[in-house]
Amino acid sequence: MADPSSYRPAPGTIPESPGVYRFRDGTGRVIYVGKARNLRSRLNSYFADPVNLHQRTRQMVFTAESVDWISVATEVEALQQEFTEIKQYDPRFNVRYRDDKSYPYLAVTVDEEFPRLQVMRGAKRRGVRYFGPYSHAWAIRETLDLLLRVFPARTCSSGVFKRAGQVGRPCLLGYIGKCSAPCVGSVSAEEHRDIVNGFCDFMAGRTDAMVRRLEREMAEASAELEFERAARLRDDLAALRRAMEKQTVVFGDGTDADVVAFADDPLEAAVQVFHVRDGRIRGQRGWVVEKTEDLTAGDLVHHFCTQVYGGEHGEAHVPRELLVPELPADVEALADWLSEHRGSRVTLRVPQRGDKRALLETVARNATDALARHKLKRAGDLTTRSKALDEIADTLGMRTAPLRIECFDISQIQGTDVVASMVVFEDGLPRKSEYRRFIIRGATDDLSAMSEVLRRRFARYLDARAETGEAGVESAGDPDAPAGPDAPDEPRVGTLVDPTTGRPRKFAYPPQLVVVDGGAPQVAAAAQALAELGVDDVALCGLAKRLEEVWLPDDDFPAILPRTSEGLYLLQRVRDEAHRFAITFHRQRRSRRMTESALDRVSGLGEVRRKALLRHFGSLKRLAAASVEEITEVPGIGKRTAEAILAALADPTGQSEPRR
């Protein structure tokens, strides 16, 4: 670890303006991004007394080996830049809200002739009416299934709707009464729109008149001895009431707000959100996040807003109002930023009394319960992972615990569709963004395939190091190197980090441990591949199935870890994950090969032109026998494409396809 004083910038070089700062490790990788109203004051706080910082902050400061920053004109700009860089760099020490999907909504495509009801995510579109958000897509589908009894509107895609009209037969929902079947003319466009309007009125909260109407019709049907119709109306009424139970009215004024509360301890914080739309609770979400520094409730509100409401789909779910336990210090800048994302004014406030205060307290109780459950579940997790890594290090004779483990596996059937997988575990947890898949073309057995994939993986790593040179790597944390605005635009190890995205390049970071799926033969093949490349600073082992033996290079006998060993359990998880990733890729390629033609492998040749070729020549056999000039007679086919088509047909297996 670096001494923070070795890279501390001179106070006079740091501006006092708003801005964003980045801490980097020895390889140039961004490990923390922060925003400051006053950059000089904020950065000095990290170096004044680093030993007494918050545990995670102290770890970050001692892990980093350089710091740089950019200054901006306003706090709103700093807020936007901070959010952009957190998304771009994915720093390991920033607070992370892992659930990054956009919210699901129940959408009605009112701009279509026959409006459709469907579940939608992402940015809002013109001509679509939205209800939500909901916490889970299944919650929407459950509500929709109940309401289709009463409002049998169209839910199918345009393709299904068109095909049903062509054959004159509705889909299953049309037969069971959950669709009015406008596709076959069972109802007119006006009648179908009336059904959709009734659905929208119900979702908007105008339910009383509808319930009274159904009750009246049910009584009339019963009085006229139409018992089947009365029973159907009774069931419709029950479905409406069940749907209404899922949307309890909490505010009578049509409030559109998110109610946010936190419960925290020195290391973690639980976040709970209730989504209130049109005065009703439409959904709930929750996270538990690590705290990287001492954070007040206002700081947590700031982090929550920038990470949850920002980004590509942020405008789809920013509410008019946020009810929070404490306002952040930059509340005006934060409100302006949120308003910019929403497209209209957003307010943040702390409710003091009444129904809104009561709901905030309910959300806070949920957060407290969630944190307690999380701590109970994860009480031994960090200790367990540390113990597992230490056991692996002891077994393999490593000086330090392997914080980055890479595992490789091969999947094939009798030498066909040979593929390999590489999975990555950091700190004992999977790092799925670093997983990689390989198509093996020069080998047909597991040993040669394992040798090939390791050569390809580590050749890429060595190429990255060669571009900078060993000197650049060693001087990454040079205490005499300039910092701040005088620092170079990129670290001298910039080849490890893509300058355009700020993310690590593929294969740029070496593992401390390589695990292969197999026993002594696989380990020997892997060791030979690493030796040929001159890689001698990476530990290697193999985990054999059935007996779960750990094989080391040049050892005649395996190491046996106890069946209850946490180290063995972690190795098994890594091995099983590599196997799952490899076999999934193998099945995809095998399925694609069994259903595709040689034309599918021609780059840039789409479905329309493939059909045109087959219509023109009648079969692949005739197409393969044609000349380039004859193929170019087909509209849209040029000479280069014709040559690619003939090359693909001459090699139907695709084995000569260039490596990607």
Curated annotation (Swiss-Prot):
Residues 16-95 form the GIY-YIG domain. The keyword Cytoplasm applies. Residues 208-243 form the UVR domain. The keyword Cytoplasm applies. GO terms for biological process: nucleotide-excision repair; SOS response. It holds the Pfam family HHH_5. PROSITE patterns: GIY_YIG (PS50164), UVR (PS50151), UVRC (PS50165). It comes from the Bacteria. Residues 476-486 have a biased composition (Low complexity). Interacts with UvrB in an incision complex. This is UvrABC system protein C. The lineage of its organism: Bacteria, Bacillati, Actinomycetota, Actinomycetes, Micromonosporales. The gene is uvrC.
